[in-house]
Each structure stands twice: as structure tokens, then as C-alpha cells.
A protein has these predicted regions:
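Short acidic DE-rich linear segments
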Residues: 142-156
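Signal-transmission coiled-coils
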Residues: 1-145
Length: 156
């Protein structure tokens, strides 16, 4: 049921949440050639996971909100930390953008901010997809073997 709703059954988290960040990253990347997007960027507001789904058009948003309450605790905690980090970067970016920067300054700000955010969004995606979950007792060798086994199980 969760997998059909694009909610990871292991972590009980949905990657759809990352669209909230991907949209603003796209606008930041376009700021150099389209400075008229600055007001749209300034209109961005942080939204917690639950609030995002409450206001979204995601088909299974109610299921996503219930799954969030039962999410794997370490995954949820790690995702919340990354959300805080991304929100802090965006708060500083929005503050800087409000200072009527030159076109060159706006372009640089957009490039820098999107460059900081993209790896965090990628990492958040790996947390949502459960790619970071491994038993603590695994050695490097057993971890490598587990990864190889997983690849073959998926038919890659």
C-alpha cells in the first residue's frame, strides 16, 4: 500500500516532500537569466513535512501524513535535521535577496545557494529511500557484500 503511494515502506517517508525544495532550487538556478523570478523566490516559505502534505495536491497526502507519524525514528530525525539546514540556507538566501543586489550579485547568489542545497536534497532523498539504514555492527566488508547482494537482488 505504501509503495503504491510512493511512500517508502521501510522509512514511511515520501520523496514528494522534496518538491518543495526542488522548485525553489530551480528558480534560484534561473535567477541569472531571469531576474524577474526574484519575487517568486522571495515568496517561498519553509514548510514542515506534515504541513507540506496538508497543503499539497499529492494523491495520497492523508496516507503520507499518517505514515509520517509512524516513520522510522532515525530516518525522521535525520530528515528533520536536513530540513532545518536547508531552511537556514534559504532564510539567509532570502535575506540577501531582499537587499536589492545587482544582477551579477543575484546571479551569484542563485548559483551559490542552489549549489549548497542540491547535495542536501540528494541526501534527504537517500534518507527518505532508506539508503542510509544499515545495522551498526556491520564491518566495511560486510557492508560492501550487503550492497553487492542488494544490487543482484534488484536484478541490476
Amino acid at each position: 500500500m505504501l509503495a503504491r503511494a510512493n511512500i517508502n515502506p521501510l522509512t514511511r517517508l515520501a520523496t514528494d516532500y522534496l518538491n518543495h525544495y526542488n522548485e525553489v532550487i530551480m528558480l534560484l538556478e534561473m535567477l541569472e537569466s531571469c531576474p524577474e523570478f526574484a519575487p517568486d523566490i522571495l515568496g517561498w516559505e519553509p514548510r514542515g513535512y506534515d504541513e507540506y502534505f496538508e497543503k499539497s495536491h499529492f494523491k495520497d497526502k492523508d496516507l503520507a501524513r499518517v505514515a509520517w507519524e509512524m516513520a522510522e525514528p532515525n530516518s525522521r530525525r535525520e530528515l528533520e535535521g536536513m530540513i532545518d539546514h536547508m531552511n537556514a540556507i534559504l532564510a539567509a538566501t532570502l535575506d540577501a535577496l531582499r537587499h536589492n543586489l545587482s544582477p551579477t550579485g543575484c546571479a551569484r547568489l542563485g548559483t551559490e545557494a542552489s549549489g549548497w542545497l542540491k547535495p542536501l536534497v540528494a541526501r534527504a532523498g537517500s534518507v527518505i529511500n532508506g539508503e542510509h539504514i544499515m545495522p551498526a555492527a556491520m564491518t566495511d566488508e560486510t557492508a560492501r557484500q550487503a550492497m553487492v547482494d542488494a544490487v543482484f537482488e534488484r536484478g541490476a
